[in-house]
């Protein structure tokens, strides 16, 4: 597991973080917060910052970075090799399919997959 800016990362109780996970928090608002009972497969990446690119007249490398928080609520399962990008909230009980790139919020109890990740279906409700 690799932690960039570890003071910006909070992991809840009873989480299972598999090997090769990368947590890249930002320096200002790019916190990464995992709730309780979160399960990640191997090779998951959390990236709470990115290059700024708003001005065409300035090379991207010279424009700096922006960051935004990532929030993973309780009881979420994140599949192998998924990438969670800055500014995303993953709702309680959601499942993120293997290899997905999550660039938008995920509703509670949604099952998402793909690049970019889209809702495939909702988890069944209790009887």
Language model features with spans:
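Flexible, glycine/small-residue-enriched loop-and-beta-strand segment within the central core
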Residues: 1-88, 115-116, 123-124
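Short-chain dehydrogenase/reductase
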Residues: 16, 77, 95, 101, ...
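Residues that flank catalytic or metal-binding motifs in active/ligand-binding sites
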Residues: 42, 98, 108
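Short conserved catalytic/interaction loops centered on acidic-Pro-aromatic/His motifs
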Residues: 51-53, 91, 107-109
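Beta-rich strand-turn-strand
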Residues: 79-95, 100-104
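C-terminal end-helix/capping segment
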Residues: 106, 111-127
């Amino acid at each position: 597991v690799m932690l960039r800016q570890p003071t910006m990362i909070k992991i809840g109780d009873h989480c299972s973080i598999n090997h090769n996970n990368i947590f890249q928090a930002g320096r200002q608002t790019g916190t990464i917060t995992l709730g309780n009972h979160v399960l990640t497969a191997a090779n998951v990446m959390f990236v709470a910052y990115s290059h700024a690119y708003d001005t065409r007249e300035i090379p991207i490398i010279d424009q700096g970075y922006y960051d935004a928080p990532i929030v993973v609520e309780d009881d979420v399962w994140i599949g192998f090799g998924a990438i969670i990008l800055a500014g995303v909230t993953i709702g309680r009980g959601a499942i993120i399919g293997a290899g997905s790139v999550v660039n938008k919020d995920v509703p509670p109890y949604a099952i998402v997959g793909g690049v970019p990740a889209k809702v495939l279906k909702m988890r069944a409700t209790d009887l």
